[in-house]
Amino acid sequence: MDVLSRVFDNEKEELDPLLNNPLTASEFRAKKAELEAELESIRNGTCKTLLDLADELRRSRDEELEIAERWRTFLVNRAQEEYEVEMKAAKEEYEYRCKTLKEMVLSHLNEKKRKIYEAKDMFDIGSESSTLLLHDASSQFIDRRKLRHRRNAGNQQNTQQLPSLNFFDDYLLFPTDETAVIPQSVKNAVRNSVNSVKPTSAEASLFSPLLSMANANPTNGRERDPRASERAERDREKAVEKGLSGATEEDIQSDLQLLKKELAKKK
């Protein structure tokens, strides 16, 4: 064993065992020569003990570098996995927000579309109402009660019962399935009867079928059969619901002229 090896082996001992035994002159010279040779090998880098120590240190270094490299690889992989997880979560959140925003925009547009359609429907209803009002010509034409007070209504005469204006409005101005087949000559006779004080015998004979429908058991000039009145009112309401916009300009002018005549008679 060389001196360097003994130094490493006995570095923890308090005293060198060689110091316990005194050396002779020959042993000292031999020991000195051994140390000088060992120092020379250390300088030249050929000392076995030094080379073994360097190899051991090199192996320890390589092991530590390998451990450090593995730890670095583990951290890189862990960071990559966390990055992918966070990117996936961020992408899902982005898609969810885009979908929510799209639904909100579509809902807002549908609401605006619904309001526009409602406004259009209200405008159409208003236009139809304006058309009905133009056809009615006046509120007196709609309110039948204002036209029921006829001249000489209280005069109890045994003459042929004349038709009331309500009957004329209900069965001629607003024709039904039953009155649609009435000939035009009969309608003209009814108009003349309304405008005259007393009907002629021919007009009375033409008007008698209509009179039996409206006034089965008359007691005075203003009383009518309730069933005929109800039916006339229903027919009038159906005609109004269907809309009066289908009337021609000739019908409107004729109705206005008739209304003016009735008002002139009352005056």
UniProtKB/Swiss-Prot annotation:
<keyword id="KW-0678">Repressor</keyword>
<keyword id="KW-0539">Nucleus</keyword>
<keyword id="KW-0156">Chromatin regulator</keyword>
<dbReference type="GO" id="GO:0000785">
    <property type="term" value="C:chromatin"/>
</dbReference>
<dbReference type="Pfam" id="PF08598">
    <property type="entry name" value="Sds3"/>
</dbReference>
<dbReference type="GO" id="GO:0000122">
    <property type="term" value="P:negative regulation of transcription by RNA polymerase II"/>
</dbReference>
<comment type="subunit">
    <text>Component of the clr6 histone deacetylase complex I composed of at least clr6, png2, prw1, pst1 and sds3.</text>
</comment>
<protein>
    <recommendedName>
        <fullName>Transcriptional regulatory protein sds3</fullName>
    </recommendedName>
</protein>
<dbReference type="GO" id="GO:0070210">
    <property type="term" value="C:Rpd3L-Expanded complex"/>
</dbReference>
<dbReference type="GO" id="GO:0045815">
    <property type="term" value="P:transcription initiation-coupled chromatin remodeling"/>
</dbReference>
<dbReference type="GO" id="GO:0033698">
    <property type="term" value="C:Rpd3L complex"/>
</dbReference>
<keyword id="KW-0805">Transcription regulation</keyword>
<feature type="compositionally biased region" description="Basic and acidic residues">
    <location>
        <begin position="221"/>
        <end position="241"/>
    </location>
</feature>
<comment type="function">
    <text>Component of the clr6 histone deacetylase complex I responsible for the deacetylation of lysine residues on the N-terminal part of the core histones (H2A, H2B, H3 and H4). Histone deacetylation gives a tag for epigenetic repression and plays an important role in transcriptional regulation, cell cycle progression and developmental events.</text>
</comment>
<dbReference type="InterPro" id="IPR013907">
    <property type="entry name" value="Sds3"/>
</dbReference>
<comment type="similarity">
    <text>Belongs to the SDS3 family.</text>
</comment>
<keyword id="KW-0804">Transcription</keyword>
<feature type="region of interest" description="Disordered">
    <location>
        <begin position="208"/>
        <end position="252"/>
    </location>
</feature>
<dbReference type="GO" id="GO:0042826">
    <property type="term" value="F:histone deacetylase binding"/>
</dbReference>
<dbReference type="GO" id="GO:0070822">
    <property type="term" value="C:Sin3-type complex"/>
</dbReference>
